[in-house]
Amino acid sequence: MKILITGGAGYIGSVLVEMLLQRNYEVTVIDNFSFEQNTLANCCFYPNFKIINSDIRKLNELEKIIKSHEYIVPLAALVGAPICKYREADAISINLEHNLNLFKIIDKDQKVIMPTTNSAYGKGESNQVFDENSKLNPISIYAKHKVVVEKNLQNLNNFISLRLATVYGASPRIRLDLLVNNFVHRAFTDGYLILFESNFKRNYIHVRDVCRAFIFMIENFKTNKNNIFNLGLESENLSKKELCQEISKHINFIYREEEFKRDEDQRNYMVSNKKILATGFEPKYNLSFGIKELLKCFTGLNLRHYKNF
């Protein structure tokens, strides 16, 4: 089985690719290595691995590559609200226009497993829990683009959309702008955190569970196709303050709540993941595991290479 992953050298892709290769799938990665990362070096060991250094916006080239692959996992993106605001033109061309063009050249029999985002729910009322049928209210440019992409994705014959919770955990291309990774990194390096709107809640998921979910959907595509799934850990709808309390179980640091400043990221929601749990998929890793993993990671890495923008 041949699988094409765009942006496969990134935070999720650099974990997913090796997991697929270990299962003997044939994997092709297209990536322009814009962060000068060497995150797929270990994967070159596998004879079932192919890597193409190219920009996914070169549509004619992409169309030739796509044809021979049964599954397509479009990970190529500028991920997160800050970088999309900072590089708005690139966010439009990569996150939005590229994906809409991609859908036009995909054959009706090819299968697409698409990462979208549960940040599309935006800001909920107190104790409101969002499921896949809830109204979307995206706040950031990133989330707004994902909503448009997901809507167009549903015009395909064979698709699955995974609305990812806030991802955390170690990866060969680790990101320090993600909330859990960022908080653990600040606790580790600075020893303190200032919290704004500390009651705002998010849902969380470990990067390896994200990859496990992609593999699960590849291996169980027929029974789950043409569906949208929230992907997070059901027990981890936590506020920023509760997240700090979890981190403090593993490292001593000071966190203080302040109200004099408004957080630019106004997302505040809880998410139900019951639909994906009903498929038989179940996350394996929790926050405690991820925090301990990150602390080990930060002990041994020169982190100046892992800024996202």
Regions found by a protein language model. Give the residues of each.
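N-terminal Rossmann-like NAD(P)+-binding domain of SDR-like oxidoreductases, especially those catalyzing
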Residues: M1-L164
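Conserved sequence/active-site signature of Rossmann-fold short-chain dehydrogenase/reductase
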Residues: R57, A120, V167-G169, V210, ...
